[in-house]
From Swiss-Prot:
Pfam families: tRNA_m1G_MT (PF01746). It comes from the Bacteria. It is found in: Cytoplasm. Specifically methylates guanosine-37 in various tRNAs. InterPro entries: Alpha/beta_knot_MTases, tRNA_m1G_MeTrfase_C_sf, tRNA_m1G_MeTrfase_TrmD, tRNA_m1G_MTases_N, tRNA_MeTrfase_TRMD/TRM10. It catalyses: guanosine(37) in tRNA + S-adenosyl-L-methionine = N(1)-methylguanosine(37) in tRNA + S-adenosyl-L-homocysteine + H(+). This is tRNA (guanine-N(1)-)-methyltransferase. Homodimer. Keywords: Cytoplasm, Methyltransferase, S-adenosyl-L-methionine, Transferase, tRNA processing. It is an enzyme of class 2 (transferase). GO terms for biological process: tRNA N1-guanine methylation. Its EC number is 2.1.1.228. Belongs to the RNA methyltransferase TrmD family. It comes from Pseudomonas fluorescens (strain SBW25).
Amino acid sequence: MANLRIEVISLFPEMFSAISEYGITSRAVKQGLLQLTCWNPRDYTTDRHHTVDDRPFGGGPGMVMKIKPLEDALAQAKAAAGEKAKVIYLSPQGRQLKQAGVRELANEEALILIAGRYEGIDERFIEAHVDEEWSIGDYVLSGGELPAMVLIDAVTRLLPGALGHADSAEEDSFTDGLLDCPHYTRPEVYADQRVPDVLLSGNHAHIRRWRLQQSLGRTYERRADLLESRSLSGEEKKLLEEYILARDDS
């Protein structure tokens, strides 16, 4: 049995091959950690043109996705995933997806993601069937497929066994409320730039402190807003103070 089952309702299910066939998410699918199924509302239309959209009442540009094909696709998705599956609509009006929210969603047994198109979907469908709306940022995309894939990728990384190293997810940016530290690989010197000596020292305590200090410093410089909502330990305060002093002296 999969750790997480995700059903996606989309007019472009082929796009989700990027999830099922490549990278970490593909490995999770093959290992049975993630089960991903797509449902196309066009398959639940009854007219010869497979119509899934219509003009908006009140006029205006664009088209709106119709209720009935979405409802029928959702019924099939719920039959597969179970009635308790959380129904999520990817929408600019939704709660912004951050790492804390990703952790919440990773604890669900099943998710049903609705990827809208055109000007959106009929509001009555949202009111009747959607549990939560989520957004990946304050900008406009052509549809909900890319946000759905972002959500799936982020959630999959937190599934036990999905990553090659047990600590990888815990060391990602934002997991501890901080940006990630710099990373280096061979060669030790490239274009006269050396890898920091501490990373070559073999002293794991010093390496841990250096990485934590770099994470704190980067967050302070690039996303200070993250520090406002995070309580720093005594060690973290000291490391950040040292980082700022060293930067100002250089």
